[in-house]
Amino acid sequence: MKFSKFFSNVQETPWYLDFLNPVINEITAYKKLLDFGTGTGKLIQILSTEKGTECIGVDTNSEMLLEAQKKLKGTKTKLFKIKPDANLPFKNNDFDYVTICSVLFHLKKNSVDYALIEAQRLLKDEGKIIILTPTGNGNFLTLSKNFFSFKNLSIYMWFYATRNRAKIWTNNNYLKHYANENKLNYKSQKVMNGFAQLEIITV
């Protein structure tokens, strides 16, 4: 099985919905949203069908986008393949939200800055960049206490695969420093019983 198909299946599990819910709850219905690093498209599938959000998803991975096309069949959501660190093909000040889930903590600093600068360009006044990232906090026991079920077995793979990079990202507070340096409003909260962090920058 290709990783893109495996990841698409993971996105259908109960724990993954728990992971995405904090982002979903931040989105006002019938707004326009860009999902940066959309992967196989679960977030924008939910938002387009449940909140009437006008969604565009972008990703660098063709196989992920092929899986997203299957998931998004029958919706008006649009998908674009992009090159790393290239300007996005959208006009300035056109989106209410830019969402970035489980992406930035994998990237080098220059790529993180690129994503944030592009997000600022694309957002309307008072638009929001919403970033969701695993924290790397917790352990096998706390994970089992909160999420154990046979449908959630993939959460253990997710936790151990992301833990080291996630801890570094969480401890560095990069987005908080970025927002302060650029005089942007920033807030954050731990979500998903402390296993993830939601960070919001308002431009």
Could you say what each language-model-derived stretch is?
Residues D113-D125:
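A short glycine-rich, Lys/Arg-flanked "PGG" loop and its adjoining helix->strand segment in the class I
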Residues T40-A86:
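Class I SAM-dependent methyltransferase SAM/SAH-binding core
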Residues M1-T28, Y30-G39, K42:
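Conserved class I S-adenosyl-L-methionine
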Residues T99:
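A conserved beta-strand element that flanks and buttresses the S-adenosyl-L-methionine
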Residues N87-N92:
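Short conserved loop adjoining the S-adenosyl-L-methionine
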Residues P134-Y178:
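C-terminal alpha-helical "lid/dimerization" subdomain adjacent to the S-adenosyl-L-methionine
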Residues G127-P134:
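Conserved beta-strand signature within the Rossmann-like core of class I S-adenosyl-L-methionine
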